[in-house]
Amino acid sequence: MKTYAGIPEENATLENSKVMLVTVPYDGTSTWGKGADKGPELFLDASENMELYDIETSTEPYLEGVYLGGEISEKSSPEAMTEAVYQKTKELLTNEGKLFTLFGGEH
C-alpha cells in the first residue's frame, strides 16, 4: 500500500486519518509546457523523503493520519474531470471531522 510520505499504514487508513488527499493529474487544457499531470505523482514520490518530525512544533503531524483517497483519472474533457472531482468530493465529505484536500496537475 502506497502511503503519503511513507507513513505507516495504520496512519494511512480512512478510519484513522484526519486528512484525506485525492490527486487530480489533469493536463487537458495546457497549450504550452505540458506535464502538469505528472505533478501529483512526483509530489507523492518526493514526500517519501520528507522529515516526519516538525522541529518548530516538536510534533509528528503524520500521527494524525493522511489517507490517500485515490486518483481522479478522468481526462476526456474539463467538464468530465470537474464532474468526477465533484462526485469524489461528495463521497469523501461524508466523513465528518476530516480535512479534504485535492492535489492537482493543472489548476
Task: Please state what every model-predicted region is.
Residues 1-107:
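Metal-dependent C-N hydrolase catalytic cores
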